[in-house]
């Protein structure tokens, strides 16, 4: 937290007839906010999920254009894992859940996970 002093002049009998008690300091505390942790959402390669389905997932849930989705899909296919995006915890958790549910509904074994960046 950051303390920022506020100065106030005293009232009372001083040279001008008041009791000048000097200057008071009131400290106002400004809370310092911390940036939220970020999480990478990753797709894992498998031998059964069609490439076109992976592209569809990337377009639908991660708002990737066709070219970017194809590039990520090929990276997943060649390297076994690929990053779909980086999000706060709650958003990453939601994306993983959406992808996993959608894959199960379409009977694909596609795996989607998140890891702290």
From Swiss-Prot:
Domain of life: Bacteria
InterPro entries in UniProt: ClpS (IPR022935), ClpS_core (IPR003769), Ribosomal_bL12_C/ClpS-like (IPR014719)
Any one GO BP annotation for this protein: proteolysis
Complexes and interactors: Binds to the N-terminal domain of the chaperone ClpA.
Family statement: Belongs to the ClpS family.
Function statement: Involved in the modulation of the specificity of the ClpAP-mediated ATP-dependent protein degradation.
UniProt name for this protein: ATP-dependent Clp protease adapter protein ClpS 1
Lineage of the organism: Bacteria, Pseudomonadati, Pseudomonadota, Alphaproteobacteria, Hyphomicrobiales
Gene from which the chain derives: clpS1
